[in-house]
């Protein structure tokens, strides 16, 4: 059994910088917001004492060696600025120390938002449609690559699981190998470059009932085909809630976008290929809401991938 990780809290220099970012006097409490028990946290909720003894809650983000790179914290900050410019539902950037001179590390401070990112064991079609619509609002921003918001060819672009399998760094299966060959021979579809969240799943969405109030954690944001985000969300919902869920996500996305999504099977396959061969630790729920084990979640990934391959156009030889 893996040993649980004890969260390492930010040091005094970082906390002093954070307090000064909201004209506060001191940090009253620090809480890790990480969902992982086996990795250190790079995201913290701070309660800061401010003028007239009023407390302010904010979110601090810092890098973690060999996991959350400096560039990812900087990308998150740039994405939040862009989200605010376009009126998107996301935290607002309060302060950023992108060279680490003031805080001793790359660090950002953003607003703390209400809402829950907990994954419900059962989900309504309305919530799935709302999730699709939330992503479509981001993808409505036409955008070319720029500093700190690079082109993204797949979700969570810092990972490339398909390449790891090709190089023998991770075991593969006949299905994953066939899918990788099909996707590579298909070629990347052409589409307008848009703003991408880059890591869309239930844990990066804040909810009040069936209303998505914000997308959070933009550290792999960038630009590219909207299918990167849509395929990622469709796959995540298939993993969590079964093979009927992606259709509701697509319906919500298309209704919000006012148009049909393109190359859906291709981007579904790309998303499925950028997952570990065995889906250990990935959440999924049975129809009765009971949690699924890794084998069952892996089979859901494989079923989603098979459907994508069945719908992917076969190249003319």
Predicted regions and their residues:
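An alpha-helical support segment within catalytic cores of ATP-dependent transferases
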Residues: 10-25, 140-198, 300-317
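ATP-binding pocket architecture of kinase catalytic cores
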Residues: 33-150
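Active-site acidic catalytic loop and adjacent metal/ATP-binding pocket
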Residues: 37-48, 54-55, 59, 93, ...
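A glycine-centered beta->alpha junction motif in the catalytic cores
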Residues: 65, 109-121, 143, 163-164, ...
């Amino acid at each position: 059994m893996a040993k649980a990780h004890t969260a390492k809290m930010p040091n005094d220099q970082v906390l002093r910088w954070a307090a000064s970012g909201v004209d506060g006097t001191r940090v009253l409490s620090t809480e890790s917001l990480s969902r992982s028990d086996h990795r250190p946290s790079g995201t913290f909720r701070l309660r800061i004492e401010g003028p007239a003894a009023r407390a302010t809650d904010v979110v601090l983000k810092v890098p973690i060696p060999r996991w959350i790179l400096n560039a990812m914290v900087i990308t998150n900050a740039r994405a939040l600025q862009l989200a605010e410019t376009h009126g998107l539902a996301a935290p607002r950037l309060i302060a950023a120390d992108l060279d680490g001179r003031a805080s001793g590390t790359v660090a950002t401070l953003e607003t703390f938002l209400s809402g829950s990112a907990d994954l419900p064991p059962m989900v309504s079609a309305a919530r799935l449609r709302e999730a699709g619509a939330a992503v479509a609002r981001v993808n409505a921003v036409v955008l070319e690559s720029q500093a700190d918001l690079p082109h993204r060819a797949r979700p969570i672009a810092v990972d490339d699981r398909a390449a790891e399998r090709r190089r023998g760094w991770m075991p593969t299966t006949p299905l994953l190998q066939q899918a990788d060959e099909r996707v590579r021979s298909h070629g990347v579809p052409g589409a307008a470059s848009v703003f991408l969240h880059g890591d869309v799943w239930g844990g990066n969405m804040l909810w009040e009932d069936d209303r998505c109030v914000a997308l959070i954690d933009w550290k792999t944001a960038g630009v590219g085909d909207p299918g990167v985000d849509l395929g990622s969300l469709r796959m995540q919902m298939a993993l969590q809630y079964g093979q009927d869920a992606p259709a509701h996500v697509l319906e919500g996305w298309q209704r919000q976008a006012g148009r049909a999504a393109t190359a859906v099977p291709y981007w579904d396959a790309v998303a499925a290929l950028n997952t570990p061969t065995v889906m250990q630790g990935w959440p999924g729920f049975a129809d009765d809401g009971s949690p699924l084990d890794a084998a069952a979640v892996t089979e859901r990934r494989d079923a989603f991938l098979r459907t994508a391959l069945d719908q992917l156009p076969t190249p003319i030889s």
